Each structure stands twice: as structure tokens, then as C-alpha cells.
Amino acid sequence: QAAVDYLRREITFTQEMGGSYLLVVPGAVGRPKKYDDSELVRSAESLRIVAQEFATHGIRAAIEPIRSAEVSFCHTISDAKAYLEAVGDPAIGHINGDVYHMQSGESHIGEAIVEAGNLLTNLHLADSNRCALGEGSIDLDTIIRALYLIGFNRDGCYVTPEPLGPGGDPYPAMYGRPEPALLDRMVDSTASYFRE
């Protein structure tokens, strides 16, 4: 029930802020071991409960696959598509990709983007080391070509810089004090590098 209540608040907040999509991670971030074999089913049932609220508020639910070191299920674009099928409601039908997570879950990031196709509504960008683009080894040209192939340059589709910095703990804001100047520099650098 807590997850459903949280989603209801976030749907309303997203609409009030003028947002068009809400990122949804199906599993508990930071818990890579499953509780039991029914996690996906429970998660899909919870999202199905609020599906019509997404539709009523005009907000797209964007499912984000996360690497297996951080969540217990939904690690790839294929997993996200299967999760959307498990939810089984046309109001829940989008994907939020993240190239950092795709590096460990997908065999080829470009092919995964093409597989997501018109379901992809946002793509998080960070380099292979989770720093700004250009500071690691990500193949940005392949990513841009794949986005071009799926016609991503259209209304309702976004590419969002999300460099969080290197390290084993990807969520420093949860456990310590983030460095706003460093995060701002990495986001600015990522946006500039992408535009080049």
C-alpha cells in the first residue's frame, strides 16, 4: 500500500510541476537479492492499481531497468517490456533507459535502444564510469545512431544527463552530502559533450 500511495502522490506532483512522465523502478533500489519469487507480480499489481491515475493526469509511466547489482529484477530493456506486459494496462507503456545500467545488462546498447523503439521516452546519459560523457569509454556515436533509427527526436522524448560520479555507492545523496558544484559540472559537461 505504501508504494501505491507514493505513486499517487508522485503522479499528482508530476502533473503539478508540468512533467510528462514519471520514472518507475519496479523493484527496491539498493536491494539486489529478491524477497521471494512473487516480487514482479506484486510490483505489476501495484502499478496496475494506479494505471488509470497515470492516464487521467496525462503522465506516462516510464519503467527503468536497473543493473542487477542494485535491484532484484527488471535489468534489461527486454525485462522492462515483459514487465509492461505483466502490468497489462495500456496506460502503462513506456521505458526509461539508462546507458550506465545498460552497460552491464545489455549485450549491445544500440540494439537495446532499437528494441525499446517507440516505448522509450527518456534516456539517462552518463559515461562508463558514471561520470560525465567523455570521461569514460561509452560509445556515444552508437547511442546517437540508435536514437536516430527509432525517431527519438520528437515531442515527448528526452535525453537526460545523469552523471552521478564514480564509486561503488551510486546514491551518495542517500548516505552523505552531495557536492552540488561537482554534480553541476558533470551535468554541464555531459550536455556539452552530447551536443558536440
Predicted regions and their residues:
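Histidine-acidic metal/acid-base catalytic patches
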Residues: 74, 78-97, 102-196
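Active-site acidic/histidine proton-transfer and metal-coordination neighborhood
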Residues: 1-94, 104-106, 181-185
